[in-house]
């Protein structure tokens, strides 16, 4: 009986993991198709669905709402302000990258009081700069339903040279805005950027280990209790 119970528990966990992976696969394909339609001028909807809010964002207080991006913001990413920095193929990787980011920071509130997050994903733009994804949480759309809205996605670069910039990450850590960190990914990111990283390693270690900051172990625990 004990063996059967253990088998059922493990099977249940495996099934939940499989379900989550299938959902992510479906989200990836759907968003990639939307990006292709946008590029070809065939995307008619003003809002494009990206995915369901990843659990890691729920760790920072976000609700499990649909994640969408406005077609106008997709235009800025691919053809406007950030044109040339991010290819469509990089953009298509956002759903998977958002499920396992490097860090998440709290940000200032939006124009209508929306709470905001900035997700630092494990992707680089064409300049080698780490990509950040600003979110507005719990936004009501024109069709009167709530979403977590991606406001943009771009690499943190110096304005003139387009070289990767690290000052923003440094200031966010220093100001105590860190809500979530994958410690292994964050340390690897910082070590790769040395000696350009502006903050002493000892101080970074203390900030990444702060007891009020969720980490990858908390994400594993949350995933184990959710499909």
State where each predicted segment sits.
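Ribonuclease/tRNase effector modules and their secretory precursors
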Residues: 1-227
